[in-house]
Regions:
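Short helix/loop capping segments that flank catalytic or ligand/cofactor-binding pockets
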Residues: 61-64, 178-181, 271-273
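Alpha-helical scaffold segments that mediate packing/assembly in large oligomeric complexes
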Residues: 91-165, 280-285
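Protruding loop/beta-arch "assembly-hinge" segments enriched in small, turn-prone residues
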Residues: 1-35, 205, 235-237, 241-285
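Helix N-cap / beta->alpha transition motif
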Residues: 88-100, 170-175, 233-235, 274
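Assembly/oligomerization interface modules of large self-assembling protein complexes
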Residues: 17, 21-89
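Short alpha-helix boundary/capping segments
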Residues: 101-109, 225-230, 247-250, 254
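Extended oligomerization regions of viral-like shell subunits
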Residues: 149-245
Length: 285
């Protein structure tokens, strides 16, 4: 909504409140991962720049015992060996300069800033997928394209590690068209999730797992120049993210620009917790 009351530093509260609401809404809606629905998000206490995520090893299957039997098992032998993975926070910020010419739309400012925050957020999370268990394309499809058999193989690899939980997949925008052409859209069933990016990005299930499209699953954003990633299949134990305080917004008068600086920021990070719980399918040929 345009409002001339914001000009020359008047009614900053009227500018701050709707702009922040629009920014937070846009960021949450545009991000696949910020909500924690796919990649779990951990809240980091204020003042901390790092959080340790515990990783517990699996223990052997229990042995059936009778009432008369002497277990003969030291409790130490059944305690899993634990370790911790660090997630370091980085500060991501974007700025918009609003001039004193009237006609300020808080919804539009919030949409642009929120989308920029969501982009940085999703790129950071997607970069971690490069450290998952690698799988080369099967070669049954044209170079750089994804076949259904590749997804089946990845699911089998993850299940073979003992992972029995829910899996999900992220498919690159480049591989999406070829995959849909291979199997036909009629083979897919719809799904309902909690934000618009997950609803719009979701395009079906293969091997029982929901698949989503992401434009950030590529060699440029992931820094894998010699390997072209086409899909990532994983459980929620593979990669986790961390965030401190959510999306923030600050507004300050900038006389030299004859307007305001509106800065949106988020403190977040992500890391691979267990690379065996996920597979990155790539074309390294």
């Amino acid at each position: 909504m345009a409002n001339s009351k914001y000009i020359s530093g008047l009614d900053l509260t009227d500018l701050m409140v709707p702009t922040k609401a629009a920014t937070v809404f846009a960021a949450q809606e545009a991000s696949l991962y910020m909500s924690g629905g796919l990649v779990p998000m951990i809240d980091v206490p204020a003042g901390s720049t790092q959080i340790k995520v515990p990783k517990l090893a699996a223990v052997a299957d229990p042995t059936a015992l009778t009432a008369e039997a002497n277990p003969g098992v030291d409790i130490d032998t059944v305690i899993p060996v634990d370790s911790a993975v660090n997630i370091d926070l980085g500060l991501y910020a974007t700025r918009s300069v609003v001039r004193d010419i009237g006609g300020i739309s808080t919804d539009e400012i919030g949409r642009v800033l929120g989308n920029a925050i969501a982009s940085a957020f999703d790129k950071k999370v997607t970069t971690q997928f490069a450290s998952l268990t690698t799988q080369e394309l099967s070669g049954t499809a044209p170079a750089g394209s994804l076949a259904v058999s590749d997804i089946f193989t990845a699911v089998g690899t993850i299940r073979n590690t003992g992972e029995t939980g829910e899996l999900f997949g992220i498919v690159s925008a480049g591989a999406y068209g070829e995959l849909m052409g291979n199997i036909g859209s009629s083979a897919f069933a719809g799904g309902e999730f909690q934000n618009s990016a997950m609803r719009n990005g979701f395009f079906g299930r293969v091997a029982g797992i929901p698949l989503f499209v992401s434009s950030y699953l590529n060699d440029t954003d992931m820094g894998t120049s010699s390997k072209l990633p086409v899909a990532a299949i994983m459980s929620k134990d593979a990669v986790k993210g961390a965030m401190q305080g959510g999306v923030k917004l600050e507004i300050a008068r900038r006389p030299e620009a004859v307007g305001f600086d509106i800065v949106a920021s988020v403190a977040m990070g992500a890391n691979v917790i267990d690379s065996t719980r996920g597979v990155i399918i790539q074309d390294a040929s």
